[in-house]
Amino acid sequence: MSRFIGSTFKKSRRFGFSILETGKEFSKGKKRITTPGQHGKERAKVKVSEYGQQLQEKQKVKFMYGLSERQFRNTFAKAKKMQGILGTNFLVLLESRLDNIVYRLGFSATRQGARQLVNHGHILVNGKKVDIPSYLLSVGDLVEVKASMKKNEKVLEALQNNEATLEFVKVNKNEVKGEFVRLPERTELSSEISESLIVEWYNRLIKK
C-alpha cells in the first residue's frame, strides 16, 4: 500500500493536483512547485500550448482513476453514446466503476488498493462476488467487503481514516458495506478537473 501511495504522491506533485483528492500529497496543504525527486527542481514557468493542456488534463484524470489508455478511451466512447453533456457523462461513468465506488466508500485508502480488493475477489455486489474493477454499478447496488476480509487491518484503517463520504454513496462502517445511492452530480466532483479539455483532446483525434 505504501508503494501505491508513494507513486500517487509523485504523480500528484507532477500535475500539481491531488489525485487522492485529499490534498495530503502536498506539504502543509500547499501545492509544491518542484518536480518529483529527492530534492526536486524548480518547475519552470513555461506557457503550455492548447494541445499540451489537453494532453496534461487527459493524463491527470487517467492517472487519477488508474485506467489504461485503452480503458480511458473506451469509457469516453461509451459516454459519447449517452444523452446529455458529454464531459459530465464521461466523469459519471468513471465514478460508477466498481473500483472507484469501493474507494469512495472508504474500503481502501487509494483507488489502486480498491482495484486490488476487487481483483482478488474480496468485494460483493448485491451479495455476489464481482472481480471486475471496471464493472459499472447501477443506482441502488449494494457493495460490501466479503466476511473474511471485514476485519482486515488495512480495510479497517482505511475506513477509520475516511474523513468524508460523498452523498451519492452511503456507507455502514460497522458492517463494512455501502450503497450506490444515485449518480453523482458534477458539482460533487473535483472542480480542478476540466473535462472539456479531454473532450477537445478526443475530438481532435477523431478529426485526424
Curated annotation (Swiss-Prot):
Residues 96-159 form the S4 RNA-binding domain. Keywords: Ribonucleoprotein, Ribosomal protein, RNA-binding, rRNA-binding. It comes from the Bacteria. The keyword Ion transport does not apply. GO terms for molecular function: rRNA binding; structural constituent of ribosome. One of its GO terms (biological process) is translation. SMART domains: Ribosomal_S4, S4. Pfam families: Ribosomal_S4 (PF00163), S4 (PF01479). The keyword RNA-binding applies. GO terms for cellular component: small ribosomal subunit. HAMAP family: Ribosomal_uS4_B. Part of the 30S ribosomal subunit. Contacts protein S5. The interaction surface between S4 and S5 is involved in control of translational fidelity. One of the primary rRNA binding proteins, it binds directly to 16S rRNA where it nucleates assembly of the body of the 30S subunit. With S5 and S12 plays an important role in translational accuracy. Belongs to the universal ribosomal protein uS4 family. This is Small ribosomal subunit protein uS4.
